[in-house]
């Protein structure tokens, strides 16, 4: 399929979810299943022998873990809610959709898979520590927070990987046929993006009342961080000839997890930042697909 058609489909999905957000938000319960299928078909084309941890991950880990808390401590001097939202936009781990996007862009899918597994594990431990020092009404015990986050992340990441590995071992013929239809992951992603866009818009409209200055700052901050993280990842990745993959490491965020963490552990309004990030990262991905055509 030509890249310009992919770009048009993604933009159409964003517009459709935005316009008919009330309708598509009703299907949010199907998002985990869609993400599971999306990863399953993406993993069918991955050579798991190439999944390994690389030295270039270290600086990216330091950025996400270190800069996120540093920015939080600086911004909280102005406003706690804004600080939490900004921190989530940096701390949020790589989205599973980054694996699909990487394959569309011709990036190193195994590399993105490796970093995604690593950063999701790290964040599941680090995030509860950070949440414990924040100004929140109800502090959830550390190990309970870790358990909740791990249960939210890893079934979607690990189970499809184990399933694909099992198929590769048991039936090479089935594995070969599945590899030929990995394009299905893109179509599933389009459906998932439409639902996510609708759910996000619905959430933003419901939360979007009260302190309008903070709301605007959350949305603008998400835009600035989205552009910065894609660019930082891209130019950092050039050192290792892996720029498209590195851009996905940092730029494509697991916003579903970030929104859930905000609503579960932090001030609910801070979730507007990762919610807005959904919109911006989809526009960036549309631009990347268009540029690659």
Which residue ranges define each predicted feature?
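Alpha-helical transmembrane segments of multi-pass small-molecule/ion transporters
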Residues: 1-293
